[in-house]
Design a protein with these regions (language model features):
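Short hydrophobic/aromatic-rich beta-strand segments that constitute the beta-sheet cores
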Residues: 64-68, 93-97, 128-134
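Bacterial N-terminal signal peptides
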Residues: 8-17
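Bacterial N-terminal signal peptides that target proteins for export
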Residues: 1-9
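N-terminal secretory signal peptides
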Residues: 22-84
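An anionic, turn-rich surface loop/hairpin at beta-sheet edges
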Residues: 95-125
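A short, structured loop/turn motif at beta-sheet edges
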Residues: 59-61, 85-94, 121-127
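Edge beta-strand at a domain terminus
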Residues: 79-82, 88-90, 127-129, 133-151
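Short, solvent-exposed aromatic-acidic interface loops
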Residues: 71-72, 98-106, 134-141
């Protein structure tokens, strides 16, 4: 009887664990997936195009994670990205996570958070970076250019 209960509990725990597991990143272009892995420069134009931040993309069990930050020099400005890449195509990737910006002259210097599942970064033309496509700042009437550069 105890054995049956133990097996039942083990099965329930396993099912719960699997239901909360992150789905693997859907890679529709292997070369683009490889290009995205590793360390990249990160920028928000309000902070600097001279002093870049860093973002790191890792693959853990088939799930691509993105995390990084650019900080202003001599102030509290920053852009921070963190989350999971859900899909990778040849010229764009989809991101499920947070993009937080804080710039002294925007939104009264308070943080502005974009939190969502379908944040898209895209390569256009001959650019050497992925740019976040939703450039309209949801907290103020400005455009944010959040860029992740090729290695």
């Amino acid at each position: 009887m105890l054995r049956r209960i133990a097996l039942l509990l083990t099965g329930v725990l396993l099912l719960c664990t699997l239901s909360f597991a992150q789905e693997r990143t859907k890679i529709n272009d292997k070369a683009a997936g490889n290009k995205l892995l590793g360390r990249h420069m990160l920028s928000l134009q309000w902070i600097s195009w001279d002093y870049f931040g860093r973002v790191n993309v890792t693959n853990k069990g088939g799930v691509y994670y993105l995390k990084g930050e650019q900080k202003g020099r001599g102030n509290t400005d920053f852009v921070r990205v963190e989350g999971v890449i859900t899909r990778i195509d040849a010229k764009e990737f989809w991101f499920d996570g947070k993009v937080t910006t804080q710039v002294s002259h925007i939104n009264d210097g308070m943080p502005c958070v974009r939190d969502g599942e379908d944040i898209v970064f895209r390569i256009t033309g001959k650019r050497k970076y992925w740019r976040m496509t939703e450039i309209d700042n949801p907290c103020d009437a400005v455009a944010d250019y959040v860029d992740i550069y090729f290695r």
